[in-house]
């Protein structure tokens, strides 16, 4: 037993030793304050316990002193709770003393869970309470386990002084699970925990209400996926940490957000981590939640404008937390949903860019630091902006319906964005001129986008604009100039109809209707005979109809019946039809009876005292024969005789007895009534009988007689006589000059005068008679020889005249005015009427601007002859004016210079200084003159307003020049120098000039001719601000439009600079065509109310004078039908020195005026083209001509004749094989010389540079390449930067027209490589694209060229059958230029010979450009310009007509 008892005791001890906790490392070391090993009473360590429910509490156990019998209790000294018999959830607390630590430390402890049934006795929680605050939730816990011994745990608490904390152990019982929970060996170590992570300091977080607060927990230690992290609130609420990020192997971080913070969210938070080795706890950080501020009062309104509001924010009194770091103004329309905010950085704030007449709601926003720091908007200020001026006037105003008496306008609808006010008015203002009086009217428009003006006059040019106005201002639309449609015209004024009757003609003239209601196109005159004085007259055929063109308000009716009253009904027509007719009656004069023919035989019978003749009845003409008379005339040989063609009939009846008393050579032998001579019957002269009071005495056998028979008609106070010599008796001398039976001249007026009494002749003897006979024969021979010589000379002169005038044509006035004109020729009618060659019932052939038949007009004197005469004008005397009709002949004769020509006439002009120029010579003004000898005369100089402090600032080298009936119409000045640019603009403003004409380039032949005095954008010259608005480049001139404003003035003026760029450096232009178009453009665009036109070249003399002289003479030719160039230049030079400076310029002025008169103004506005096209293309059935045909004939006349010296290069032998025809050679001055080198090949190609309407040298016109010129062709394309090639002919090997481009590959043509890129076919067009480069100069790169082959033009036709397809070529060309070469590349155009087809295409392109740029169509001018450089451009009338037709088609496509 003893041995067994001892053995049992030993086993018990061993068991107790197993339950005892193992010794801790360093367990014997001294623990810091707060630690406790429980070897002594726990109170000695500062620990305390709190009594739990029903006495459930911690107990200190020391099994060494008091062994425990329950084997589940460990051995040693420790704190323990017994959960046996306890209800679930009972808690017992062990409180450690309060700790204040300054550095990193660690609390570790051991815990023990045991039970008899191996079930968990409950839970152990550890709390860390900071600064005496709430206990919160546990930071560490263990439950549901039974330990196999003591287990160590660590607490890494990061709460430091001055804060303090307390650790609380809490045990929680679990019902039905008896057992023990023990804690022992609590230590506070002065080093980091080995396993539990330590937190770095957690920072306070400040947020604004509603924002998410984010805490970042940073811990030192290793992170494990099994670790648990959370954010613990002061009151115990836990929030899981959302994001964990490993910083490095010894540090990691985690973040957690507190969402949607509010004032209730204000608290303290700390980070807690639970790992396998224990827990880490951070310090508490505060979550501070601020209330964003908001103002108490609304903003204060200080000022109101149309687009702004001045406010005072009133942000001093707020609700919420400061500080305020930002003030903002929030505004919105009261009806809108959008809002904008502006930052306010001053006590007052101006809201900009507001909409006018809009109600706004304005609030103030205040912002404090932090996200979400902007408070709610403060109370609103509600106010409305003022109205503003409209943004612009009505736009895209157009006329959508034009009628004779009304117009319908349409414009782009606009709303508030344009009116800038909700209350506005829209008004249409219009004005027109009627009967030389200007009318203005306006109407208020109620509709939104269209309106019809009613009650207008037909064909009235109306200037109208729309006016948009509101309470603050008004804006106008662009002015529209529109013409109402034509209507039928009113009646021709009856009182204006005047008639000039003749025997078989009636000249009638009238005035246009007072209300033309359009362009009078035709007058219709219906005429018919309504009665005759001659009962036998057959009037059935005396009727007809005549049409007259608008500029012919007169007509000569021929082929009428004498003595007949005609009814004339005249009515005028416009394109709309004929107006009401008006009728008048005019009677022709009676005509002398028509005498029958008599044979030159001897009389029926003759005795010594009688002679028997045969009398035949006369045929009445307009009035019955009143009486027949037999007249016997004695032929006295000693008296001189008049020529037969001026012998008159015998109007004064003289009886035989009175003849003796009056010494009359004739007497009336008989007077017979018509009833006495119903048929032919014989009559014996000298039968000694009396007939109706006249004695027929016997004839004297010693005298010679002529027997005359005359018939007389009387009616309405007119007496007309016709007579015939029937026979002679006694063979009177000189009778051979007149054959018996020949009718004599007619007496055109009634005569009742008495002859003066003459003393009777005495008889002479036969010797004297014989002498008279001999003298008469001699005289007859002399006269006959003189007549023959005269006739021969006239025939020679006529032949020479016809040769000389072969190229002449009739010249009418420059514009369509009814001025008297006449054909050039030697035949002139000495009567008061010049008769037209037209048919009675036909149209007079005419064209716009000129008459191809002379206009009929009443004259009291004959036209002066135009036969060539020797002109000899003395020097220094005025020369006579030249009629427009005579100008061609005059210039031709003056150029011949036979005795007196242009050289002598020019030298007769005053040269050099002719007046004082003292002001210009002053020292202060010398540097203002470009040339010392071209300066301003004192009497005509422009005086500028004197600037303050500079008495010489009134001088500028400029003179006033008078125009045609317009004083000071021009200012001639020098090209501005750098020193005078400001003075130049002062002059422009002072004189209110709207046009500057510049006839020089800035630099010519390397010398500065004029400085650039205009800006590219905006420039200020002194106190004048000049702004460039638009630049319109054309082939021969450029039009720049500026606005000009002077400082201190509100007025803004528009100014145009017309810059003629084509005047050559030397001499004068080859042709005046371009300059004439330039002059017309200046005249058209210069406002009538503007000040003088400022004209300058370099010196302001030569070219300046040419422009002014041409413009002035064109006005004179238009208004007077004459030109007076000599005296015009003479007057110009009296106002400025040496205007028109050289003889060459003087001749050029003549040539320009001649071309203007020959060609006229053929431009047609686009708006009138459709209506006028019918008239100008209509074929007159009488003349088989049209105005287009007349234009083309004129074009052929004025086309320059090519001389061999003009195309000398093409005529060189080495170039012969490069020309298809030696008849079609390019002019030397138009040649594009090849630049690329190709071996020994010359630089010549049969091509010519041609201008388009708006680009100089835009076209290169050439022939289809020959086999030996293909390389030259591609050199041309490359050298002249040609981006397009247009081919207008078919390929034909018979004519050596082969393909000259590669197909689907590349090829080399001389130095040029041509590479095929693509091709497509579009109806009649094959479109190819090539890439070309010069292989000899690869550094120049390659170029893209399009090739347009037009296959819709058959070889046998002058024109293509389709206008639309050719227009498609033009449009493709335009599109390519816009997209690929920026309109800088040229276009090669070729047909077979580079003539008709090429010219037609170039003309069509230019017409399209003209329509786009200037809204006019002038086919004549375009073709004339092309022919100036190549005479075979547009070769046939059909091609010329085709250009017109394509223009019409082009307009129809819009």
From Swiss-Prot:
Disulfide bonds join 217-271. Residues 800-852 are annotated as: Disordered. It catalyses: O-phospho-L-tyrosyl-[protein] + H2O = L-tyrosyl-[protein] + phosphate. Residues 30-770 are extracellular. Residues 902-1156, 1188-1450 form the Tyrosine-protein phosphatase domain. It is found in: Membrane. Glycans are attached at residues 82, 102, 141, 212, 425, 514, 551, 605, 658, 688. Residues 34-195 form the MAM domain. GO terms for molecular function: alpha-actinin binding; alpha-catenin binding; beta-catenin binding; cadherin binding; delta-catenin binding; gamma-catenin binding; protein homodimerization activity; protein phosphatase binding. The active site is at residues 1097, 1391. Its EC number is 3.1.3.48. Residues 197-288 form the Ig-like C2-type domain. Substrate binds at residues 1065, 1097-1103, 1141. The chain crosses the membrane at residues 771-791. It is a single-pass type I membrane protein. Its main location: membrane. Residues 824-841 have a biased composition (Polar residues). Residues 1-29 form the signal peptide. Belongs to the protein-tyrosine phosphatase family. Receptor class 2B subfamily. May be involved in both signal transduction and cellular adhesion in the CNS. May have specific signaling roles in the tyrosine phosphorylation/dephosphorylation pathway in the anterior compartment of the adult cerebellar cortex. This is Receptor-type tyrosine-protein phosphatase T. It comes from Mus musculus. The gene is Ptprt.
């Amino acid at each position: 037993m003893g041995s067994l008892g001892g053995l049992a005791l030993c086993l018990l001890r061993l068991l107790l030793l197993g339950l005892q906790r193992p010794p801790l490392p360093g367990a014997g070391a001294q623990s810091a304050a707060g630690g406790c090993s429980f070897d002594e009473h726990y109170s000695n360590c500062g620990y305390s316990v709190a009594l739990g429910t029903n006495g459930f509490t911690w107990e200190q156990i020391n099994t060494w002193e008091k062994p425990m019998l329950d084997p589940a209790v460990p051995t040693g000294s420790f704190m323990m709770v017994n959960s046996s018999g306890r209800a679930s959830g009972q808690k017992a607390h062990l409180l450690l003393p309060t700790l204040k630590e300054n550095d990193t430390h660690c609390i570790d402890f051991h815990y023990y869970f045991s039970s008899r049934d191996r079930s968990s006795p409950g839970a152990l929680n550890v709390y860390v309470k900071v600064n005496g605050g709430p206990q919160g939730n546990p930071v560490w816990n263990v439950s549901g386990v039974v330990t196999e011994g003591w287990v160590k745990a660590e607490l890494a608490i990061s709460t430091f002084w001055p804060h303090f904390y307390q650790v609380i152990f809490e045990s929680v019982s679990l019902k039905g699970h008896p057992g023990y929970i023990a804690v022992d060996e609590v230590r506070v170590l002065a080093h980091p925990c080995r396993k539990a992570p330590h937190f770095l300091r957690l920072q306070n977080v400040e947020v604004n209400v509603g924002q998410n607060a984010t805490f970042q927990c940073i811990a030192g230690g290793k992170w494990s996926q099994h670790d648990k992290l959370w954010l613990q609130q002061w009151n115990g609420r836990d929030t899981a940490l959302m994001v964990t990020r490993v910083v490095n192997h010894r540090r990691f971080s985690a973040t957690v957000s507190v969402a949607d913070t509010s004032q209730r969210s204000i608290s303290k938070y700390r980070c807690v981590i639970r790992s396998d080795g224990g827990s880490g706890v951070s310090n508490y950080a505060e979550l501070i939640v601020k209330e964003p501020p908001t103002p108490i009062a609304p903003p204060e309104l200080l000022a109101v404008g149309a687009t702004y509001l001045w406010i005072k924010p009133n942000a001093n009194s707020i609700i919420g937390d400061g500080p305020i770091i930002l003030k903002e103004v929030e505004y919105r329309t009261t009806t809108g949903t959008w809002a904008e905010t502006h930052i306010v950085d001053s006590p007052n704030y101006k809201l900009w860019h507001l909409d006018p007449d809009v109600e706004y709601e304005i609030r103030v926003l205040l912002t404090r630091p932090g996200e979400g720091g902007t408070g709610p908007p403060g109370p609103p200020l509600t106010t409305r902006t003022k109205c503003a001026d409209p943004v612009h006037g009505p736009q895209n105003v157009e006329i959508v319906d034009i009628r004779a008496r009304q117009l319908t306008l349409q414009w782009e609808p606009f709303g508030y964005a344009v009116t800038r006010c909700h209350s506005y008015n829209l008004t249409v203002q219009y004005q027109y001129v009627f009967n030389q009086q200007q009318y203005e009217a306006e109407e208020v428009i109620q509709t939104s986008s269209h309106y019809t003006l009613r009650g207008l006059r037909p064909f009235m040019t109306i200037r109208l604009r729309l006016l948009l106005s509101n309470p603050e201002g008004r804006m106008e639309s662009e002015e529209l100039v529109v013409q109402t449609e034509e209507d039928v015209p009113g009646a021709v004024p009856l009182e204006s109809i005047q008639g000039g009757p003749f025997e078989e003609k009636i000249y009638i003239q009238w005035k246009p209707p007072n209300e033309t209601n359009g362009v009078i196109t035709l007058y219709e005159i219906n005429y018919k005979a309504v009665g005759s004085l001659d009962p036998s007259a057959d009037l059935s055929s005396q009727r007809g109809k005549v049409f007259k063109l608008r500029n012919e308000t007169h007509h000569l009716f021929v082929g009428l019946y004498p003595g007949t009253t005609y009814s004339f009904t005249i009515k005028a027509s416009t394109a709309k039809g004929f107006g009401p007719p008006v009728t008048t009656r005019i009677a022709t004069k009676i005509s002398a009876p028509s005498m029958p023919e008599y044979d030159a035989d001897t009389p029926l019978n003759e005795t010594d005292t009688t002679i028997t003749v045969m009398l035949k009845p006369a045929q009445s003409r307009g009035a019955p024969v009143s009486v027949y008379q037999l007249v016997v005339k004695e032929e006295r040989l000693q008296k001189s005789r008049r020529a037969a063609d001026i012998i008159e009939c015998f109007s004064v009846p003289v009886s035989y007895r009175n003849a003796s008393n009056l010494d009359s050579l004739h007497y009336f032998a008989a007077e017979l009534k018509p009833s006495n001579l119903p048929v032919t019957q014989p009559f014996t002269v000298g039968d000694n009988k009396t007939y109706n009071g006249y004695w027929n005495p016997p004839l004297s056998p010693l005298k010679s007689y002529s027997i005359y028979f005359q018939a007389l008609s009387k009616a309405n106070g007119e007496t007309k006589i016709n007579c015939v010599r029937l026979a002679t008796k006694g063979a009177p001398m000189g009778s051979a000059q007149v054959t018996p039976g020949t009718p004599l001249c007619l007496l055109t007026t009634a005569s009742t005068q008495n002859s003066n009494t003459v003393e009777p002749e005495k008889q002479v003897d036969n010797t004297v008679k014989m002498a008279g006979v001999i003298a008469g024969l001699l005289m007859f021979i002399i006269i006959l020889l003189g007549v023959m010589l005269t006739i021969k000379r006239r025939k020679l002169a006529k032949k020479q005249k016809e040769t000389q005038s072969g190229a002449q044509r009739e010249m009418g006035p420059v514009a369509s005015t009814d001025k008297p004109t006449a054909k050039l020729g030697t035949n002139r009618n000495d009567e008061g009427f010049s008769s037209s060659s037209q048919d009675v019932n036909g149209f007079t052939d005419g064209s716009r601007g000129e008459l191809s038949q002379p206009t009929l007009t009443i004259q009291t004197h004959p036209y002066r002859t135009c036969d060539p005469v020797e002109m000899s004008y003395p020097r220094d005397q005025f020369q006579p004016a030249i009629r427009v009709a005579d100008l061609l002949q005059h210039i031709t004769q003056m150029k011949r210079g036979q005795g007196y020509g242009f050289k002598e006439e020019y030298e007769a002009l005053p040269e050099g200084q002719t007046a004082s120029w003292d002001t210009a010579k002053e020292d202060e003004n010398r540097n203002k003159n470009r040339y010392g000898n071209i300066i301003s005369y004192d009497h005509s100089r422009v005086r500028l307003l004197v600037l303050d402090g500079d008495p010489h600032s009134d001088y500028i080298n400029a003179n006033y020049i008078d125009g045609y009936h317009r004083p000071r119409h021009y200012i001639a000045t020098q090209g501005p120098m750098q020193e005078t640019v400001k003075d130049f603009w002062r002059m422009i403003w002072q004189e209110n000039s709207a046009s500057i004409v510049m006839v020089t380039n800035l630099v010519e032949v390397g010398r500065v001719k004029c400085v650039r005095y205009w800006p590219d954008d905006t420039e200020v010259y002194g106190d004048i601000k000049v702004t460039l608005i638009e630049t319109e480049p054309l082939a021969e001139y450029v039009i720049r439009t500026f606005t000009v404003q002077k400082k201190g003035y509100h007025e803004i003026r528009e100014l145009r600079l017309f810059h003629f760029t084509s005047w050559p450096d030397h001499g004068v232009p080859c042709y005046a065509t371009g300059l004439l178009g330039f002059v017309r453009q200046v005249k058209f665009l210069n406002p009538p109310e503007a000040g003088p036109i400022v004209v300058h070249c370099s010196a302001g003399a030569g070219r300046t004078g040419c422009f002014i002289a041409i413009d002035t003479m064109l006005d004179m030719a238009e208004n007077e039908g004459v030109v007076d160039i000599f005296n015009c230049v003479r007057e110009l030079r009296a106002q400025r020195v040496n205007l028109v400076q050289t003889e060459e310029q003087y001749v050029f002025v003549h040539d320009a005026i001649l071309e203007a008169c020959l060609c006229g103004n053929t431009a047609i506005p686009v708006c009138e083209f459709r209506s006028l096209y019918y008239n100008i293309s209509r074929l007159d059935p009488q003349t088989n001509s049209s105005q287009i045909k007349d234009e083309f004939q004129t074009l052929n006349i004025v086309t320059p004749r090519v001389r061999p010296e003009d195309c000398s290069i093409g005529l060189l032998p080495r170039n012969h094989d490069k020309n298809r025809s030696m008849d079609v050679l390019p002019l030397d001055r138009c040649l594009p010389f090849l630049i690329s080198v190709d071996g020994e090949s010359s630089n010549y190609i049969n091509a010519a540079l041609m201008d388009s309407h708006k680009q100089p040298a835009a076209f290169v016109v050439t022939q289809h390449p020959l086999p030996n010129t293909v390389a030259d062709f591609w050199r041309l394309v490359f050298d002249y930067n040609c981006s397009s090639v247009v081919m207008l002919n078919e390929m034909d090997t018979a004519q050596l027209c082969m393909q000259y481009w590669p197909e689907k590959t590349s090829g080399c043509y001389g130095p040029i490589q041509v590479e095929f890129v693509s091709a497509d076919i579009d109806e009649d067009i094959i479109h190819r694209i090539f890439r070309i480069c010069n292989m000899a100069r690869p550094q120049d790169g390659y170029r893209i060229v399009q090739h347009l082959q037009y296959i819709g033009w058959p070889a046998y036709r002058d024109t293509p059958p389709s206008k639309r397809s050719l227009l498609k070529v033009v449009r493709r060309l335009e599109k390519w230029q816009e997209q690929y070469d920026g309109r800088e590349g040229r276009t090669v155009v070729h047909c077979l010979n580079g003539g008709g087809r090429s010219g037609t295409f170039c003309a069509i392109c230019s017409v399209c450009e003209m329509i786009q740029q200037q809204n006019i169509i002038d086919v004549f001018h375009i073709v004339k310009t092309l022919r100036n450089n190549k005479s075979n451009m547009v070769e046939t009338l059909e091609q010329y007509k085709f250009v017109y037709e394509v223009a019409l088609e082009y307009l129809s496509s819009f």
